[in-house]
A protein has these predicted regions:
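Short proline/glycine-enriched turn/loop segments at secondary-structure junctions
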Residues: 38-43
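Generic short beta-strand segments
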Residues: 32-37
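Hydrophobic beta-strand residues in large extracellular and virion-surface proteins
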Residues: 6, 28-31, 52
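C-terminal edge-of-domain segments
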Residues: 44-58
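Localized chelating/binding microdomains
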Residues: 2, 27-30, 47
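Short, well-ordered alpha-helical segments
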Residues: 3-26
Length: 58
């Protein structure tokens, strides 16, 4: 069993990164998703992250 971590500033970037990774010949066991928001004086900062738990097919 292995994991791959993803961390992006925009949800579309996270989606694209995960979809590209999933093109590999792997068996996905689970995907965990998290959204973190930080307030700055001028703006809100979003952090979209995911962890893909998978097995390689050998």
């Amino acid at each position: 069993m292995q994991i791959k971590m993803f961390d992006e500033n925009h949800e579309i970037d996270l989606e694209e990164a995960i979809n590209e990774f999933l093109k590999q010949d792997i068996e996905v066991i689970d995907i965990k998703y998290q959204l973190a928001i930080m307030m700055d004086f001028k703006e809100q900062i979003y952090c979209y992250s995911a962890m893909v738990i998978y097995n390689t097919k050998n």
